[in-house]
Amino acid sequence: MDPERKRIEEDLRGVVAGDVLCDDVGRSLYATDGSLFEAWPLAVVRPRSSEDVAATVRWAAERGVAVHVRGAGTSLCGGSLGGGVVIDCGRFMRRIIHTGADSVRVQPGVVAARLEDHLGRMQRTLGVDPANAMATTVGGMIGRDTSGSRFLRHGAVRGRIAAVEVVLADGSIVELAPAAAALAGEAATADRPARLAAGVAAVLEASRDVIRTFQPPTRPTHGGYRMHDLEREGLVDLPRLLCGAEGTLGIVTAATLRTVPADGASAVALLLFDSLDVAAETAVRLLPLGPSACDLFDRRHLALARGTKPAFELLIPPVAEAGLLVEFTSPEPAECNARLDGAIASAQQARRGCIDTRRAEDSFDAAFFWELSRNVVSTLHGVRAAMRPVPFIEDIVVPPAALPDFLRRLQEVLKRRQETAMVFGHAGHGQVHVRPHADPREPAERGRLESLAEEVYAQAAAIGGTIGGEQGLGLSRTPFFTRLFPELAATCAEVKKLFDPAGILNPGRVTPAAAVQTVVAFRRPLPAAEAATDGERAAAPQLLPLLTWDRARLAAEVDACNGCGSCRSQATGSRMCPRYREEPCEEASPRAKADVMAALLSGELDPRTSAADAVRAVADTCFNCHQC
């Protein structure tokens, strides 16, 4: 460790009770997430309390250093990467503080699946159901304003949030709830929430036309700061503003969330079509019937599912070009079954109709069907090919009625550019993920992906759509957001100045980085022996001489992990790393081993450290049980 980082480590250890990591191996674990990006932090702090978070932010603010808050590190858009101090709330701040009759108070590191298990014992639920609920944290869900397949029934996190404890950019700790704005002339004596509410109210008033134009009520979710519904009953809902803010306005250290009665009976079916267009048109026609979920899959998604399990091969005919997973929920089984009957009948009346229908006969069938939405996508990350579907053009939201039009436009762009992509999403609220095939470690691919994204996002904007509606803008979408919606981006920048005038909180997300620059690149390529020239082989560091793998196989195994975080699963019904469940720290996750080996192979870590105690400590958390 160089003297400068040693000094930083000593400084931070002097003000926080939690862990501080400044060594190269520790930093390598936080240089990537579920996205294509790589950015090595200056330091990592794993706080034990709100006071630790506040002390870290104060230290950073005094020195003009950026702060990036992190939950599970599952972001697909580089949500928590950067060259400043990463604050990992998932290690220690994972306590359910209080459970009431209709609310729950939690720390930001609580895993969504664990929270649902806890609430389920009282027949309550948060309702919001991201596909990666087994790993993602409440703090991350707030930062992204997460929704999920059941948005039609339960909405997004912003609809559940009641109050938050937050650390602001100056290191102060405040409790935020819907607040009355401080009146003119009272700012000097008003408390901090009232002053912030007054500032936000002024921005909303000045930008009312912009917000109405670019965050219309006809679109279920919105990119950037969600400002369309912050004023209610004379109050400014500051907790709602933090939902989707991606840690750029403050760092949530506790949250009070409203809960609702757990869903009763449900009825689920998979409708299969010979055309993606017809599937999308059918989804629009089913919306008046009131489904709780309506997810869309293209033929590549279905083909991938067929390859993962023999049961999917039996369930899905190879001729299927698209599918809709439809769910109805009701207190009474007879009612939701009748509504599903109506949906199936409506689908079969479509132009050319659906070619097949698969109905879940019981809860086990339903859980299996739901794997199409929740588990199949994670297998993309292990595709053993250089060109694979990658998470770069994600999270497009269009008005649901415009979904068929957008998909036609998308197919035209892909065909003209001779691109291949996988398409899936939540058709019920117009949310689409596009995964173009690319080699994520090939430096030249970034330009091609950005050019494709520019075209696809422009098509969405042309029909009243936006980007970043469910997973945030992150590093990958913020530049496109500012170019596509400059007036709305300028309004977001005004809000950012109110909370973080120096721009130290997660710069480069939602608004462009200003005072603090965030330099981020795609992940470094891993040299493979069979592709290297003789000169490159001679220059390459000879790693792990006792390992029986050759370099090419080692690189392929490491590259099979993209950092999605599924190996951090805390879901009680799934099989995953028991060591991580016992000690949920990043170095205990299976992902950590791939991160360290990737850093060694790419040259970011000195190969001489391969035998160091820090590397050995990461390796020793694995006892080869193969549950990952």
Over which residues does each language-model region extend?
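A glycine-rich phosphate-binding loop feature that marks nucleotide/adenosyl-phosphate handling sites
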Residues: 26-29, 75-77, 132-139, 223-226, ...
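Terminal amphipathic helices with adjacent charged low-complexity linkers/tails
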Residues: 255, 288-387, 419, 425, ...
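N-terminal flexible segment immediately upstream of the FAD-binding catalytic core
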Residues: 1-58, 62, 72-102, 131, ...
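Ferredoxin-type iron-sulfur electron-transfer modules in oxidoreductases and energy-metabolism complexes
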Residues: 523-628
